[in-house]
Amino acid sequence: MSAAEKLAADEKKPIGQPTGQPTGLVMLLGALGVVFGDIGTSPLYAFKAALLHFQDDGSVINRLEVYGVLSMVFWSLVLIVTVKYVLLVMRADNQGEGGILSLMALAQRVANPGRMRYWLGMTGIIGACLFFGDGVITPAISVLSAVEGLEITYPAMKDYVLPIASVVIVALFMVQWRGTSIMGRVFGPIMAVWFLLIGLLGLLAILHHPKVLLALSPGYAGLLLIQHRLLAFIVLGSVVLAVTGAEALYADMGHFGGRPIKQAWLWIVLPALTLNYFGQGALILHDIKALDNPFFLLTPHWLRLPMVLLATAATVIASQAMISGAFSMARQCVQLGFLPRMTVRHTSETEQGQIYVPQVNSALLIGVLALVLTFRTSDNLAAAYGIAVTGTFLCTGILAVVVFRRQFGWSRRSVMVVFGFFFLLDSLFFASNMLKIPQGGYVPLVLGGLLMAMMTSWSAGRRLLMSRWRQDSLPLASFLARLPQSRILRVPGTAVFLTGNPDYVPGALLHNLKHNKVLHERVLFLTVKTLDQPEAGPDQHLEVEELAENVYRVIIRYGFKESPNIPRDLDALRARGVPVESMQVSYFFGRETIVAGKAPKMPLWRLWLFLVMARNAVPATEFFRIPSDRVVELGVRVPI
């Protein structure tokens, strides 16, 4: 095996796994630190936000309302997280990888060609856009709710909550470029202590008021809906805050595998969350004034400051998981053709999944700070939280229907009964959250809408661009047929021409012949393709075909979670009999200047957006890791 092939094999090891096989305990601890940060910090604000609705009219909260909300929270955790995600959706892995885009690719693969694939793609894009909208809110509400614990211990610190939260958030984003390998080692133990402590505090409160366990019955949720009707429906919009982060269980399967995530949820996280929520309920039944901040008032006075510090650490971990997820999602969107090329920096020599995307990091920092300074408290931010989460739930359910029907062979009746129930439940949560739009729910919708416009405009623009290239290009077969009779001067060396379509002559080659009137003695037509799976298999990755003497067609395939590295992969061609030294070849690129045509084929606002993104896209040389001193760029003006 060549050095290049060995490096390629090393980069294809499962993400997040070191060279040695990690033990089950290590993987379980890792899952605690990465997967459950968001849902694990929900007790800081979810239960309080739900109960506050019953105080809006000045009335006193009664036992039924406490029991009803607890019942809703518990059964949401059971039905949405445990049944839907852990038992069902996590079965639909794409070669071990999860997440909305992996599920979209899987659904498109088993769907019939045509409009169905298009709409499945749109569903996946909507889910991805909502994920980014959620990613802006999660760090803001999590860090704010943790720092607000200072008010309980030191009331004089109230005016410092906002500055402290802002400093924590800025510091979190400013260290992203260094990666998370060092911090990641302590994430698991910190979250293990977090879940142990919040579960223990909840248990102690339950022991003082054991009747609160009656709320385990779903009957109390039903009674609340019957008695309060519209108000109970509104409360659902806050109850869903208890299950934010459920999507992470599925999205992070590629890092840890399904089994450690399921074990961590069933053995540690679900029991700890249940105990803490019911402990908060017991405390409020004992003292209604505890509603000011039931999570921190559950903690003994002497432990509150350490608990604030631990909560801040836990919310930073939750935010870090969301930020890392946004980086990974952005890379997948680029690879799948939904966003322009971005700078992707690897922050670890051993773990492929640890990346840093500067553009995404800056956008998230600006968005999170804007939310913190605008909404100012976690209670206010709770109104903006939930729409993106429930929208993602709906998108996941729609895509799962196709996978379970087509790939797993479920009967139409089984799919309708099982996923019809969850579609109804998710729709109730989503509809309830839509009522939050005037209070702040518009935030994730606006963010998601902007991203949706960007993704669809970029995808449509690239299709138009490819169509225009095909119109103006020469079929490769015709070019090769004329090559032996041509009087083109051949010069020493190897030239690599990148082309989006392997059956047509690259525009850069035609421009090179037009202006320089020479052709290298060895020519490679290189096409890079992205597969609908996380990683390309050894038999898929590299394809070589000799079209004529010293003229080759090379196709390199990457999975949507892989980062392209063309020089490395070209070195592997030597094992296929192609004498190529990647650092001694010339790479020819067509640097297109895209302009509006006389009769644009897309709306002007979409065209403007596409042109802006195209001009700000990372150069192909940087994206494909090609040394700039080996590149020849030839300008091409392309009207669309």
Swiss-Prot record:
Family membership: Belongs to the HAK/KUP transporter (TC 2.A.72) family.
Name this polypeptide is given: Probable potassium transport system protein Kup
UniProt topology in membrane: Multi-pass membrane protein
Function field: Transport of potassium into the cell. Likely operates as a K(+):H(+) symporter.
A GO CC term attached to the entry: plasma membrane
Catalytic activity of the protein: K(+)(in) + H(+)(in) = K(+)(out) + H(+)(out)
PANTHER family: LOW AFFINITY POTASSIUM TRANSPORT SYSTEM PROTEIN KUP, OSMOTIC STRESS POTASSIUM TRANSPORTER
GO terms for MF: potassium ion transmembrane transporter activity; symporter activity
Pfam families, per database record: K_trans, K_trans_C
HAMAP family according to UniProt: Kup
Keywords: Cell inner membrane, Cell membrane, Ion transport, Membrane, Potassium, Potassium transport, Symport, Transmembrane, Transmembrane helix, Transport
Superkingdom as given in the UniProt entry: Bacteria
InterPro entries, per database record: K+_transporter (IPR003855), K_trans_C (IPR053952), K_trans_N (IPR053951), Kup (IPR023051)
Spans through the membrane: 24-44, 69-89, 124-144, 155-175, 186-206, 230-250, 265-285, 307-327, 355-375, 384-404, 415-435, 440-460
Subcellular location: Cell inner membrane
